Design a protein with these regions (language model features):
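ATP-dependent carboxylate activation and anion-phosphoryl transfer catalytic cores
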Residues: 1-167
Length: 167
């Protein structure tokens, strides 16, 4: 049997970051264009506004990121200014073992990187997902690292950091 796990024919999974920075609902614009309408803005109308971060929340057990299927016993989404939670989770939701482990995307926006990181820290603190293991502790750990706040990292940084945790 074959399953389509995800089809990104137009939008990327990170599109909420673009939406937050530019203040444009990309899905709405896509539907407008598909309906034969023009977009509701011009290229010159777009202005970069602040900094946005998205973390992909997965039902995975650390440190090896193995799948963590099961039933959500308690769920509370964070909220507030500059916080967006995209998820279909609810109390009692059953996460099957057959598909991608992505269970939500937490997107934050602030005037600058420092404010976005502070909002991410607050939002992760408000977020409750009980009943399965998730990658939320990974993001708490990352936010405690100076390099994340200063932007002093590269594509190998995470792998090296994870190695230090398992030592």
């Amino acid at each position: 049997e074959f399953y389509f796990i995800e089809m990104n024919t137009r939008l990327q999974v990170e599109h909420p970051v673009t939406e937050a920075i530019f203040g444009v609902d990309l899905v709405r614009e896509q539907i407008r264009v598909a309906s034969g309408l023009e977009m509701s803005f011009q290229q010159d109308d777009l202005e970069i506004n602040g900094h946005s971060i998205e973390v992909r929340l997965n039902a995975e057990k650390l440190p090896n990121f193995s799948p963590s299927p099961g039933r959500i016993t308690q769920y509370h989404a964070p909220g507030g200014l500059g916080v967006r939670m995209d998820s279909a989770l609810y109390d009692g939701y059953s996460i099957p073992p057959y598909y991608d482990s992505l269970i939500g995307k937490l997107i934050v926006h602030g005037r600058d990187r420092a404010e976005a990181l502070a909002r991410l820290n607050r939002a992760l603190g408000e977020l409750i997902i009980d009943g399965v293991d998730t990658t939320v502790p990974l993001f708490h750990g990352l936010l405690a690292e100076k390099d994340i706040h200063t932007g002093d990292y590269n594509i190998h940084w995470l792998e090296k950091w994870l190695d230090t945790l398992s030592d």
